[in-house]
Amino acid sequence: MIRVATVADCVQNPPRNGVACGRGFTVEHMSKGEQMQEQKMPVVAVVLAAGFGTRFDENNPKQLVSVGGKPIVCWSIEAFENNDRISDIIVVVNERVEETVNELIDEAGYAKVRAIVPGGAERVDSTLAALDLLKQTGIPSGAKILIHDGVRPFVEERSIDGCIDSLDQFNAATVAYASTDTILLTEDLGDRKVVKSVPERPNTFRAQTPQAFRFGTIVKAYELAAADPDFHPTDDTRVVVDYLPDEPVAIVDGSETNLKITTPSDMPIAEGIARSLDPEHAKEEAKARMHAVFAEAFSQMHSR
């Protein structure tokens, strides 16, 4: 079993020869003069799965709910496990289900998962838990970090690759999907919301994940944010935008299917996406459509 890693573990047992807490990071605890193996910076995926909303099941969080015969969090982990460019994965979980997630990871044989980290009450606490662990491993500031919502099970490989590639030119990037709806910015007027402005639609996007950063950039942004008593970010990109305003954040194309499963009403859509990703199911659906076309054509021929 993967043991749950804590910052204390890493302080007491610093990484050696590329081995860190949990199963061991591929990053090295670099001293002066040392270099990364094969001169490559690590590319680390952080899967945030510490939320514990009970709208699905009072005993289990939604990331453990099955979609297409597989727990939601497993879909998310697999997206990075199957990407050859990802070197390491950290999974941040709620302590109440860490044993269950541990077992799921072991059963699936996810080889890139190096540690399971206890998350916090808020999303920001979970991100900070992962960043603190990475600091203790001695990960270089130039490492590429992709932070992903564990309840976005259908992130596409092209979006992951787009994040990794964008960090060659920028220090921050986020997957986002162009809005097809007109977006309204509002303000309060008495007890009502009223329209303040209407941004041009070509400039409006819906933020998704992963959100990607050079390690030094996201750490610096959070350090600056920590000094702000009004610090209440909704995602990691917001931290960079607010506290490193001169740091451009690149947009990486997302997709309609990269949905965040939030309520039970999202489940039918998620199940449909899961079915479409099953090659056998897709083949059967194509065959059924073909039969329907022939049946319709045959019916029309005999009705003349």
Regions found by a protein language model. Give the residues of each.
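Residue-level signal for inorganic ion chemistry
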Residues: 47, 73, 130, 149, ...
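N-terminal glycine-rich phosphate-binding loop and ensuing alpha1 helix
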Residues: 37-100
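Short aromatic-hydrophobic micro-motifs that form the base-stacking/packing surface
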Residues: 144-148
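Conserved core of the sugar-phosphate nucleotidyltransferase
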Residues: 141, 154-252, 293-304
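Short phosphate-binding loop-to-helix
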Residues: 106-143, 237
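SAM-dependent methyltransferases
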Residues: 2, 31-46, 50, 235-237, ...
